[in-house]
Amino acid sequence: MPSEKDRAKKNLVQRLALKSCLAKETLSEFLGTFIMIVLGCGSIAQAVLSREKAGGIITINIGFATAVVMALYATFGVSGGHINPAVSFAMCTFGRMEWFKFPFYVGAQLLGAFVGAATVFGIYYDGLMAFADGKLLITGENGTAFIFATYPKPFVSVPGAFVDQVVSTMFLLLIVFAIFDSRNLGVPRGLEPIVIGLLIIVISCSLGLNSGCAMNPARDLSPRLFTALAGWGFEVFTFGNNFWWIPVVGPMIGAVLGGLIYVLFIQMHHSNPDPEVKAEPAENNLEKHELSVIM
């Protein structure tokens, strides 16, 4: 028989456990986005602060993509692992998530990204102070703001940067929709995060030059706000012809466009396009995963 201590411990766990599904999902999105930012921006910080002696563009692309993979494995079964307001927006737009959850998901993602940026700043504080004699600069050879948020190259125009964000996020969601389409080739259960990681690597390697390939409003806006408050100043919002809004608005449009293209070109032409008829989930499938991203 369990001891009094074991029963007390079990009762404590039961009391602390969240009962609300929405609360669980919100907490999951916060944690997932936090993981992504700490490990992803951490890979950038390591490369920048070592002046590329401990990393470079390859390690950044692989590091950030792997950070997303780890975040997805941590959250898929609870919230669907969106960790991106653009993904949540697309899921709501195409009826894969209820709209009332949208502000909770986005709020958790924004907060998780902000706390993640603060964590990276704390971990690399000494390195940041030593990098440019204590100066926190946005641009130049001693610039460090792009550890946290994306900035356009000098040759990129505002329209060009906007199209860049729309197109890169369009490809992200187009392929994500394909990955979770049970009537297409699909991906073996449990390997979806790895394939998404590979997708992020190829997008970063092919469409990342112009403005850093954010594809995620939370990944860019919250860390940018943190840098504004932490010492880089509010020039982080005006730099690049007020570039800050482009990684926020562009991915939202691109996400819906990518989903729409997949639906119009592939999904609606399946032999059984009726959305009411769906394959029964296997016993080991996680319900939240099905509710969030099932095609």
Curated annotation (Swiss-Prot):
Taken from the record's topology, the Extracellular segments are 44-57, 124-160, 208-210, 226-243
- Residue ranges crossing the lipid bilayer per the database entry: 25-43, 58-77, 99-123, 161-178, 191-207, 244-264
One Pfam family assigned to this protein is: MIP
Listed CDD domains: MIP (cd00333)
* Catalytic function, reaction form: glycerol(in) = glycerol(out); H2O(in) = H2O(out); urea(in) = urea(out); (S)-lactate(in) = (S)-lactate(out)
Q: Which family does it belong to?
A: Belongs to the MIP/aquaporin (TC 1.A.8) family.
Q: Function, please?
A: Aquaglyceroporins form homotetrameric transmembrane channels, with each monomer independently mediating glycerol and water transport across the plasma membrane along their osmotic gradient. AQP9 is the primary route for glycerol uptake in hepatocytes, supporting hepatic gluconeogenesis. It exhibits broad specificity and may transport various small, non-charged solutes, including carbamides, polyols, purines, and pyrimidines. AQP9 may also facilitate hepatic urea extrusion.
Q: Which residues lie within the membrane without crossing it?
A: 80-92, 211-225
Name by which UniProt lists this protein? Aquaporin-9
